């Protein structure tokens, strides 16, 4: 971001390229990898998968099976793959606004319509307009794209809000792509991140959860993200949408993700 605006008076403040250094353990490991000089293709080490499964259990009380994890080179890629996996003739994508721009471009990239649901400001906090949601015409199989915690308004949705959204999802027969890349950056001790898919087996069955270490540890340039999809058929559709287009993360991405976590 500083390269883009180095000669102007603009101060770039977006979050993907933070101005904090990555943890010393990560930079040290990157230096060791560079010294070894091997930058070939990578395969996810079992130790990283085990670390993520343990992390989900310990931090979020969310029992994740290692077979549910699918690796991606980035979160924007995951948003687009989710749209392609769900895409059918007439499929509608619903999302809250304002929102990270790829939430709005991903549907059109797959030939889908995007319905924007403006968030409402209540007591100094942005939240979902559930009355507006209920007024929408939807069909079974439509996709709700959730940004949780929300970028850019910063809302960490409460259990009550997520439960209300889950009831709407099940009532309408929707699928959900939940981008939870900021889940580790909850800065208030009184708040706790709740993965949307952890609410119930019924919700997990209809949810694609996207996560990555990139925002938390300033690793966006190493391209290592993952999707958690418990439904075998939904996971098959997701992987089919990736086929021949989406590469695995690089070896260094896998290794630095493990060190960071």
Predicted regions, residues:
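N-terminal small-domain helix-loop-helix segment of the aminotransferase-like
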Residues: 1-74, 81, 260-261
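Conserved PLP-anchoring active-site segment centered on the Schiff-base-forming lysine
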Residues: 85-107
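A short helix-loop-beta submotif of the ANL/AMP-binding
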Residues: 109-115
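Helix C-cap/helix->beta junction micro-motif
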Residues: 110, 171-172, 203
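Active-site phosphate-binding strand-loop segment of PLP-dependent enzymes
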Residues: 115, 120-191
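Conserved core segment of the aminotransferase class I/II
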Residues: 201-261
């Amino acid at each position: 971001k500083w390269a883009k605006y180095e000669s102007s008076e603009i101060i770039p403040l977006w979050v993907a390229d933070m101005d904090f250094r990555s943890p010393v353990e990560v930079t040290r490991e990157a230096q060791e990898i560079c010294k070894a000089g091997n930058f070939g293709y990578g395969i996810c080490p079992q130790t990283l998968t085990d670390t993520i499964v343990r992390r989900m259990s310990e931090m979020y009380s969310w029992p994740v099976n290692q077979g549910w994890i699918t690796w991606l080179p980035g979160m924007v890629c995951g948003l687009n793959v989710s749209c392609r996996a769900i895409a059918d003739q007439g499929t509608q994508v619903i999302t809250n606004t304002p929102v990270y721009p790829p939430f709005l471009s991903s549907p059109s990239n797959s030939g889908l319509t995007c319905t924007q649901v403006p968030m409402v400001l209540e007591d100094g906090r942005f939240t979902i307009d559930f009355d507006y949601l209920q007024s929408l015409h939807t069909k079974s199989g439509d996709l709700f794209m959730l940004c949780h915690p929300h970028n850019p308004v910063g809302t960490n949705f409460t259990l009550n809000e997520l439960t209300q959204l889950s009831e709407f999802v099940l009532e309408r027969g929707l699928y959900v792509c939940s981008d939870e890349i900021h889940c580790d950056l909850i800065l208030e001790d009184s708040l706790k991140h709740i993965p949307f898919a952890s609410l119930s087996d019924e919700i997990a069955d209809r949810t694609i959860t996207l996560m990555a270490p990139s925002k938390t540890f300033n690793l966006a340039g190493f391209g290592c993200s993952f999707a958690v999809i418990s439904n075998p058929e939904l996971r098959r559709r997701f992987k089919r949408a990736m086929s021949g287009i989406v590469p695995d993360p690089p070896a260094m991405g896998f290794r630095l993700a493990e060190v960071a976590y």
